[in-house]
Amino acid sequence: MAVGTGTSLALSSLLSLLLFAGMQMYSRQLASTEWLTIQGGLLGSGLFVFSLTAFNNLENLVFGKGFQAKIFPEILLCLLLALFASGLIHRVCVTTCFIFSMVGLYYINKISSTLYQAATPVLTPAKVTGKGKKRN
């Protein structure tokens, strides 16, 4: 069930903060093995998604409904935040965070385009009826 913009802003901001704090609290454990560094990148991409949601909800509250996130500054700022948080854990976490974030961003864009883009009607050329050049 969907919630309002203000509630979504509060929830995504809280989840971003908790995820960042959890990543910092368990940074030694996340950097200890190969699989946990991949998990650290996955957590970083979750931080990217939640911070992007919070940032876009804030813009919708300030600028009005229908304001969409663009690549610069919204997506790049949230991506740099997530990459920085992952970099505090391990350098491999940065790479996996980037890969997981790009996959997540692709699916977010795909879902939002099917939900929010208006269908454009397909224009077919009409057959011209009229006097044409006669051939012998």
Curated annotation (Swiss-Prot):
It is found in: Endoplasmic reticulum membrane. Its main location: endoplasmic reticulum. It comes from the Eukaryota. InterPro entries: KRTCAP2. Residues 1-5, 56-75 are lumenal. It is a multi-pass membrane protein. Residues 24-34, 109-136 are cytoplasmic. The modification Phosphothreonine is found at residue 124. GO terms for cellular component: oligosaccharyltransferase complex. The chain crosses the membrane at residues 6-23, 35-55, 76-108. Keywords: Endoplasmic reticulum, Membrane, Phosphoprotein, Transmembrane, Transmembrane helix. Pathway: Protein modification; protein glycosylation. One of its GO terms (molecular function) is enzyme activator activity. One of its GO terms (biological process) is protein N-linked glycosylation. A motif (Prevents secretion from ER) lies at residues 133-136. Component of STT3A-containing oligosaccharyl transferase (OST-A) complex. STT3A-containing complex assembly occurs through the formation of 3 subcomplexes. Subcomplex 1 contains RPN1 and TMEM258, subcomplex 2 contains the STT3A-specific subunits STT3A, DC2/OSTC, and KCP2 as well as the core subunit OST4, and subcomplex 3 contains RPN2, DAD1, and OST48. The OST-A complex can form stable complexes with the Sec61 complex or with both the Sec61 and TRAP complexes. Interacts with PSEN1 and NCSTN; indicative for an association with the gamma-secretase complex. Subunit of STT3A-containing oligosaccharyl transferase (OST-A) complex that catalyzes the initial transfer of a defined glycan (Glc(3)Man(9)GlcNAc(2) in eukaryotes) from the lipid carrier dolichol-pyrophosphate to an asparagine residue within an Asn-X-Ser/Thr consensus motif in nascent polypeptide chains, the first step in protein N-glycosylation. N-glycosylation occurs cotranslationally and the complex associates with the Sec61 complex at the channel-forming translocon complex that mediates protein translocation across the endoplasmic reticulum (ER). This is Dolichyl-diphosphooligosaccharide--protein glycosyltransferase subunit KCP2. It comes from Canis lupus familiaris.
